[in-house]
């Protein structure tokens, strides 16, 4: 019997993730569904958990939001996002395409709530590639249900403040739910997607 997997992602990512899923060629059925905000993602999980074998969740915070709530069915969950090496490549590709870019003025949104700096310079030079994931994981583990619900608004407000104060030129975004609002404010954004092989490896864990 074929496994059933549900991928939960933001509305913005539903189409590109559906395209990636179509290229996986795995011996399972993967359905891609969307959520609107961290406060409601557990409801989306619950609506599918009774009839699925596992979940792919877009982002560690979204996964933490689900795990912070009690559920009638506890299915295996893995989170997916671009990995650290992929973020490095995305930033280096930006620099190669435009040598005039100032890495001090490119902001990585997911680093805003975490101590250690949120610029591309901080990520590329001050944060060791081998220590970034544990650093983020430790912060994620300390999150509470209340703090999770406020993260996106906090990050969005800080990015708008920085943009209005001319403190940045671009956002490398991983909180995909805030992308429409960032673009409505005219803030240049990029969203690097995880690779097909990365999603395939995670799906095989379920």
What are these regions (language model features)?
Residues 1-206:
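Alpha-helical/coil-rich non-catalytic "connector" segments in signaling and regulatory proteins
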């Amino acid at each position: 019997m074929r496994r059933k997997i549900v991928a939960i992602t933001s509305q913005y990512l539903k189409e590109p993730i559906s395209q990636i899923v179509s290229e996986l060629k795995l011996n399972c059925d993967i359905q891609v569904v969307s959520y609107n905000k961290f406060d409601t993602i557990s409801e989306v999980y619950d609506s599918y958990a009774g009839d699925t074998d596992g979940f792919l969740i877009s982002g560690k915070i979204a996964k933490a939001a689900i795990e912070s709530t009690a559920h009638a069915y506890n299915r295996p969950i893995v989170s997916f996002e671009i990995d650290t090496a992929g973020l490095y490549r995305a930033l280096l590709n930006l620099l190669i395409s435009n040598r005039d870019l100032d890495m001090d003025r490119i902001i990585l949104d997911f680093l805003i709530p975490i101590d250690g700096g949120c610029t591309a310079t901080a990520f590329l030079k001050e944060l060791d590639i081998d220590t970034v994931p544990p650093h983020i994981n430790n912060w994620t583990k300390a999150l509470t249900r209340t703090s999770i619900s406020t993260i996106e608004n906090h990050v969005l407000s800080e990015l708008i403040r920085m943009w209005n104060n001319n403190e940045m030129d671009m956002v490398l975004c991983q909180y995909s739910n805030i992308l429409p609002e960032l673009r409505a404010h005219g803030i240049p954004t990029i969203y690097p997607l995880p690779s097909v092989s990365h999603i395939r490896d995670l799906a095989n864990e379920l």
